[in-house]
Amino acid sequence: MAGGAVMTSTPTKPTVAFAHLGCEKNRVDTEHMVGLLAQAGYGVSTNENDAAVVVVNTCSFIQDAREESVRTLVGLAEQGKELIIAGCLAQHFQDELLESIPEAKAIVGTGDYQHIVEVLQRVEAGERVNRVSAVPTFVGDEHLPRQRTTDQAVAFLKVAEGCDYRCAFCIIPKLRGDQRSRPIESIVAEAHQLVEQGVQELILISQITTNYGLDLYGKPKLAELLRALGEVEIPWIRVHYAYPTGLTPEVLAAYREVPNVVPYLDLPLQHSHPEVLRAMNRPWQADVNDRLLDQIRDQLPDAVLRTTLIVGFPGETEEHFQHLMEFLRRQRFDHVGVFTFSPEDGTAAAELPNPVDPDVAQARKDALMALQQPISAERNHSWVSRTVDVLIEQHNPQTGQMIGRCARFAPEVDGEVHVQPGEDGQKAAPGTMVPVQITGADVYDLSGRIVGARDMVAAIRADA
């Protein structure tokens, strides 16, 4: 979570600090809790030194995330802080956390963060509070106060909560419940609110965004949602977490026809081999991987493709892994993230036989990343000499250099564009979007300079 205080008005009650861990969906929950407490008159800060009580919104997706959450909790407890533990770790281990951390004054589940003010008031009255619904059912909307903690120009917009799928390796349905979609009108209303705050990029998030609306309307409605959001005056709309089978012709047509939807597809494919996918409880996917990617590239020639993969899944053989290597070599993704399998208690995969040695899994991860790096470099180099819009996010007043992102880079997970002033010294402030001619590229990042009017006139005359 970004440093510094995030108060919107003079508080009338004590200051509460926040520590945020985990994914963008967790971040939105944090922002709602911040907004609710600020509305109730509490001061809110991201610096734990400002407060005696710290709300820690935790992650429990994989073992590394759990350990980071626990380290954060223990560190704050050793500083003498009183803790309100929220989020996925709280949903997962509520009783154990209350027993093992005396400084934990309250536990708040993933479907209960809207009660944060009541919880804090009960803590202040001397209670120890367990506010965890056994089955999360809540999903926030545009009426729930929210105070953003991200860069001024970027906002995550949660379109649904929970997940109806049961992938063998994933614990998310146990932590966040079944899918609950928001109405299209609610999402569009919040989008307008965010635009009024100066947001230039909306990132649509849920567990499976291509399944948006299935529970609410009886069929997926992502295409209709994108077309409705196309009426919102915002430069970029980005979609995260697209399940392969949900990329229907209607959805791809919306990508192609709605001008402010960027052609960036985040596809968590996980693997390529049919036997591994069957063990992951994703048996249908092997039939669509290559065909789907061909369709995307046919309909969206400038599409930027990101995927995430899992290696070391129980039973993964060297043959399975080589199949995945060949798939990656053939498909030439722009961006790839690779994870080694982490067995999660309560998931089907945790009970599977034939575990892969951790050293073998790590070696496979390293091999995939080594294969992908020159592909990513080549994909980036294909953008050299193009002029693209760049959203400026940082500016160094000493050097004049700026850092931003073009549409091919999502925040935090992808690269950056390092921007030099234009030939006449043109600069841009954070939160603004400017044309930049790309002059260089490496594995992860691009570099370029701002294009001024003189450059644009010269380019047009050269093309005439």
Swiss-Prot record:
EC number annotated for this UniProt entry: 2.8.4.4
Cofactor: [4Fe-4S] cluster
Domain Radical SAM core, first and last residues per copy: 149-378
Main EC class the enzyme belongs to: transferase
Residue stretches making up the MTTase N-terminal domain: 14-125
Record: residues binding [4Fe-4S] cluster 1: 23, 59, 88
Keyword annotations from UniProtKB, A to Z: 4Fe-4S, Cytoplasm, Iron, Iron-sulfur, Metal-binding, S-adenosyl-L-methionine, Transferase
One Pfam family matching this protein: UPF0004
Domain of life: Bacteria
Similarity comment: Belongs to the methylthiotransferase family. RimO subfamily.
Name the record gives this protein: Ribosomal protein uS12 methylthiotransferase RimO
Organism: Parasynechococcus marenigrum (strain WH8102)
Gene expressing this chain: rimO
